[in-house]
């Protein structure tokens, strides 16, 4: 091995190499500087364009020229990466305040990377870029050598507004990343002015001004204010954006999409659900976007009965119509170190940067003014002694020392006199020189006054911030509206909600008819079969069947055959126990309370949802004593309703329905006491059950007789649950009972 070779442990070399690479990526590639809000490549592009004279009023120039200058002079990396960074700064849908004004194909919201090659596009700086460049060259920036040491480039640009917040940025470094969202210029400028006026301003006071991020889209930010506050307090979090939609002629029109969301991709996502039959209520999709309406996506429902609010809620949960954006306010501070900062820290530190920039600008200008005043003093001497000055210049071999010695002027003043052309000497006028002197002395005093007074400096900072906010500011684009969390619909929710009537025959054949105006008994039945029951509901509600053993089953109406035919046997869809038949059928809302009972005198309260069993074999709902039967389920409208029980022997008992327990299944509690011996012999059992509103009147039909029981008469049969009841003569063979309630109409959705 050569003596010149350096021996180094491998682990030390790799550690140092990785650390050096990490620091390079963090400091020189991925993270923005808090002062101008730019990464190095962005800064170099903007500076190179300014050096090419491509300001907002210049003619457009080929983008390849700019990229070539950037790569050749400042940024020795790939041309495609450099051009892509330039494209992003030119896209109004990517940057809140674009830095580059592009001509040609610079991509589209649907496909941001569809931009043309740099040999085809042309560009120049936008008007907004003046905020970063206008004070350059006024002593405001530190300059560093470029990569090959042949020229200088600015270490940062003297931004007049907090561009770090206005345009934001994203980047992935080594071991860290940054995701800074864009904000509204007027809000940020106002917050900065407030912080100058009141240095002790709190974060909450700033958040009254800076409402939240402001993306280059009209989509809504739906994150709650409390969560947004946490983001700006901790410097980390996420916000959610949701598309904006309206109804037009029954269809949904989406007019704004979340940031960087492609309308074409959204339509593909919705179409995929339609192909997979997960959106049966949507009939058609259209993209009607054009130059006048950059975003116009149309979703057409199958009918005007479709709940489009529910459909959109589902699409928000399952497509990019709602999107989350990570926020990580990580940046390189004034100390040169990367750190995650909160909103108050960012604005405070940027104001320190801005204050230093303005101070440097004023000092630079003051130095220029003082130099000019010094020269004017010398020129004034020359004017007052014009003949002697001319004589010295004509006669002396070294006129500069002679002038300095004769008039007591400095070398700079003597050089200024000697550099004047004769025609200028002839035009020198004392009033003109003194006029310029007076103006510059006023400016000098003004500059020195501002530099010496913090109050005057603050006034200047506020004035400049307000002027820039007025010149470049605009209204907020992304409104903040708190919305409920979107939830995807289940298969059950996706079923169309249309009125249907389910018809059951005596032989157990079932069918579904559209609408509620159906003459169920008058339908066509198989030979030997006839009508048994009908129930009305919606097509997206399950229909529940209860068999003679107390088991319950549920079927979606959409799976049932049409009423145009004679239906299908339930045994093809359900697996009933041997010898069991379907006894009852009902459709209600999921939370509707029902009374389930057996003729053995037991019962309980449950909800309709407790009856739903999707499997073929169903589930045990009510436990029946030997030889007992299931009574028809009864709807409970109000917790104050009364339950009236009538036995075969004519005994009546009435008590509050809330005396019964609420169960999901079981035998229940005793409603009315029926002696087991009589029940076993069939001499007695529960014959009738009614849920009555208070103050109801009953008309009981026994043969040709009518027995009317008014509220005061019904009070005689009121007792505790489980009692024997009161024996009412002549009520052993009740044909039917009519209920007259002054408070509400009784349920009439089922026929049996």
From Swiss-Prot:
EC number: 5.6.2.2
Ranges for region Disordered: 472-492
Cellular component terms per the entry's GO annotation: chromosome; cytoplasm; DNA topoisomerase type II (double strand cut, ATP-hydrolyzing) complex; extrinsic component of plasma membrane
Main location: membrane
Record domain Topo IIA-type catalytic: where: 31-494
Biased composition (Basic and acidic residues): 473-492
InterPro entries xrefs: GyrA/parC_rep (IPR006691), Gyrase/topoIV_suA_C (IPR035516), Topo_IIA-like_dom_sf (IPR013760), Topo_IIA_A/C_ab (IPR013758), Topo_IIA_A_a_sf (IPR013757), Topo_IIA_dom_A (IPR002205), TopoIV_A_Gneg (IPR005742), Type_II_DNA_Topoisomerases (IPR050220)
Biological processes, Gene Ontology terms: chromosome segregation; DNA topological change
Subcellular location: Cell membrane
Enzyme class: isomerase
Catalytic activity: ATP-dependent breakage, passage and rejoining of double-stranded DNA
Site (Transition state stabilizer) residue list: 119
Keywords (A to Z) from UniProt: Cell membrane, DNA-binding, Isomerase, Membrane, Topoisomerase
Gene Ontology molecular-function annotations: ATP binding; DNA binding; DNA topoisomerase type II (double strand cut, ATP-hydrolyzing) activity
Site (Interaction with DNA): 39, 75, 77
Active site: 120
PANTHER family in the record: DNA GYRASE/TOPOISOMERASE SUBUNIT A (PTHR43493), DNA TOPOISOMERASE 4 SUBUNIT A (PTHR43493:SF1)
Family per record: Belongs to the type II topoisomerase GyrA/ParC subunit family. ParC type 1 subfamily.
Self-association and partners: Heterotetramer composed of ParC and ParE.
Protein name (Swiss-Prot/TrEMBL): DNA topoisomerase 4 subunit A
Organism: Salmonella typhimurium (strain LT2 / SGSC1412 / ATCC 700720)
